[in-house]
């Protein structure tokens, strides 16, 4: 049991855990299949293989999931109240895109007891791009009282393949939504869960030490020589697998994701010159495009 448990009465529907449960239930009722997160270190929910492969081709998809995400360069040693190197996203992927998708999203906020009439909710144009995945889309940031809480994207390309039909991706920033709902100014004060005896576990109880230690590792103590070797080897393995007769595309994609993670760790320590960085991104993107192209051909 955590030593710094606190006792106070509150509505458990406002906990971080209940926010996830509410979103899962809501999107399940909109005919989304609730799946599990990808068990690999990724920078965003978009990297989930169900999203990458699911957006390619004409087969309909409708899925939602929580994804643990890592961006090593965003670490702040636990000192920034709303900036993290490890965080959680709730991802919704639907193809073809429903005509009322924005209404569905706003209704999901209502389920979280976020009043769309009394709060300032704005869709701010912000077209999205992921160079390593060869992906881009048209969309918006959703601001809640001046803070970005969601990214709303209509995918145009993934892996260099035109998306037809268009896929809609909704990415909820769970930490910031929880901060708003619980009226907290610091993410580490957000209540993650409350048991039947009113014992409370905060976000800080669970993740503050992790954030501090990983920030130190990412910026100071990571073995860059090892990580560069792993980056190259995983990218090489991804390309090697694709050359096999049976085209093992899912394993190839996994090794691509591993290589991207090590690239991000190296990038956090600023180990690349501008030219080197662009060259590596191009090599990663070329591999992702080959995976996407081979997958697209198999769907025909």
Curated annotation (Swiss-Prot):
Record GO terms (molecular function): ATP binding; glycine-tRNA ligase activity
Main location: cytoplasm
Keywords noted in UniProt: Aminoacyl-tRNA synthetase, ATP-binding, Cytoplasm, Ligase, Nucleotide-binding, Protein biosynthesis
UniProt keyword 4Fe-4S, yes or no: no
EC number: 6.1.1.14
Keyword flag Nucleotide-binding: yes
InterPro entries for this protein: aa-tRNA-synth_II/BPL/LPL, Gly-tRNA-synth_heterodimer, Gly-tRNA_ligase_asu
Top-tier EC class: ligase
GO BP: glycyl-tRNA aminoacylation
A GO CC annotation given for this chain: cytosol
Catalytic activity of the protein: tRNA(Gly) + glycine + ATP = glycyl-tRNA(Gly) + AMP + diphosphate
Subcellular location: Cytoplasm
Similarity remark: Belongs to the class-II aminoacyl-tRNA synthetase family.
NCBIfam families: glyQ, PRK09348.1
Subunit relationships: Tetramer of two alpha and two beta subunits.
Protein name: Glycine--tRNA ligase alpha subunit
Lineage, top ranks: Bacteria, Pseudomonadati, Pseudomonadota, Gammaproteobacteria, Enterobacterales
